[in-house]
Amino acid sequence: MLEPGDDAPDFELPDQHGDLVSLSDFRGEHVVVYFYPRADTPGCTTEACGFRDSWDEFEDRDATVLGISDDPVSDLDSFAEKYDLPFTLLSDEDGSVSSAYDSYGEKNMFGKTFDGVFRNSYLVGPDGTVERVYEGVSPDGHADEILADLDG
């Protein structure tokens, strides 16, 4: 698992509009990189809407939010539009970025084993280093937890 003080792995992924976005594009500001299993499912919607509802507070702190899943771009576009999400969603269909962030691997659900995205988040500082790691987060209140850490 990445730890505070580690360099956050840079990446380049397509966003919900198909445009390529890199972590390094946001150098100089805080970035919340949050990994979620599947767009438009109950937990992931709760988490995304928490970030949406707190968006102004993130902007007030010069912080941005990047949500990453292994969904295709078209699903991310629909998800962002349906819930009026103001932040960037990124498609990591091959799981390579999620893996680099220790957020992809074997999961068990309903007696089935499969590979998928873990619900982890990272607060990346303006210098590109990991400031905080949130492992196995609860979708409820996660945005507020990160805002409190930004104020810390």
What are these regions (language model features)?
Residues M1-G152:
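Chalcogenol-based redox active-site neighborhoods
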